[in-house]
Amino acid sequence: MAVKIKLTRLGKIRNPQYRIIVADARTRRDGRAIEVIGRYHPKEEPSLIQIDSERAQYWLGVGAQPTEPVLALLKITGDWQKFKGLPGAEGTLKVKEPKPSKLDLFNAALAEAESGTTAAATTPKKKKAPKKDEAAEAPAEAAEAPAEAADAASES
């Protein structure tokens, strides 16, 4: 029986996601698989390529023929070079940086809040009210002084 390593398509329109499978060469594209050995998501940045290297090596060793797209993926992961005994078995696969967990982000923000900035606001508030009060107090004091003098004169 001729065995091929090929892709089966999953996902929505314009968002393809593939499984890398081992299947009989006569089965249709999304037909019955002998074994699923990986997955490929081309729309992610960088593309997600996960292949079970041990199982891929086994199937290549027993004569399974990869299709052209799968061959390209095997070269990226380094499995094809490993199978053929060529240099570059580490592959050229780019791995996405893991996102920090929400708990780590929360703890970092909490530590920053506890250790940090209890100073005044960065933008100083406008001090319009004291200027108006000083200007209003000066004429009021001037008006009170003659009135006090008049009160003192009338009491004596």
Curated annotation (Swiss-Prot):
Q: Which PANTHER family match?
A: 30S RIBOSOMAL PROTEIN S16, SMALL RIBOSOMAL SUBUNIT PROTEIN BS16M
Q: For the region Disordered, give the residue spans.
A: 113-156
Q: What is this protein called?
A: Small ribosomal subunit protein bS16
> Low complexity: which segments have biased composition?
113-123, 137-156
Q: Which organism is it from?
A: Mycolicibacterium smegmatis (strain ATCC 700084 / mc(2)155)
- Gene Ontology biological process terms, A to Z: translation
NCBIfam families attached to this UniProt entry: PRK14520.1, S16
Family matches, as HAMAP family: Ribosomal_bS16
What keywords does the record list, in alphabetical order?
A: Ribonucleoprotein, Ribosomal protein
Pfam families the UniProt entry points to: Ribosomal_S16
Q: Which family does it belong to?
A: Belongs to the bacterial ribosomal protein bS16 family.
**Organism domain of life:** Bacteria
The record's GO CC annotations read: cytoplasm; small ribosomal subunit
Q: Name one GO molecular function term.
A: structural constituent of ribosome
